[in-house]
Amino acid sequence: MSTTTAKVLPRTAAPGLAVPLLSGGTYRLADRAPEHFTMVVFFRGLHCPVCQPQLRELDRRLDELTERGIEVIAVSAETQARTRQLHDEWDLQRLEVAYGLAEEQMREWGLFVSRSVKEGEPELFNEPGLFLVRPDGTVYYESILSMPVGRPRLDDLLGGIDFWVAEDYPARGEA
């Protein structure tokens, strides 16, 4: 497997994403048609204590996102069994959660990839990333981290989204 990681630029086509859903079936980003954005949240997994509050907040505030025309999917490289475990332990009620992200997919999205350094971590997993993808399939916003901390605060992101939508603000960082 190549260790080359792509750089995903705003205003370009988002990489493909087809992953199994914990609720059944397959999530395909190309099939999504939200009013404004699809929010793709790549999270580390069950072993990550920082992922739990992020996903729980998204789950709790899903209506706020939906009202803004935003669909949300949370994705990790976890197995189905571990994803079921985190879904139950973290008490996620409505957030769509996908699992089985392959290393190649991690790299196509420009995510940092880590190897296990302690018991309880998957052998290979992605570090956090958050993308907003427009209905036309182009990347609008991205936040990619090499460590579990430093994720965008949801309140800050929602404030930005409100402004961007109201002002028809273009994606930046494309040059």
Named regions from a protein language model:
Residues 1-175:
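Chalcogenol-based redox active-site neighborhoods
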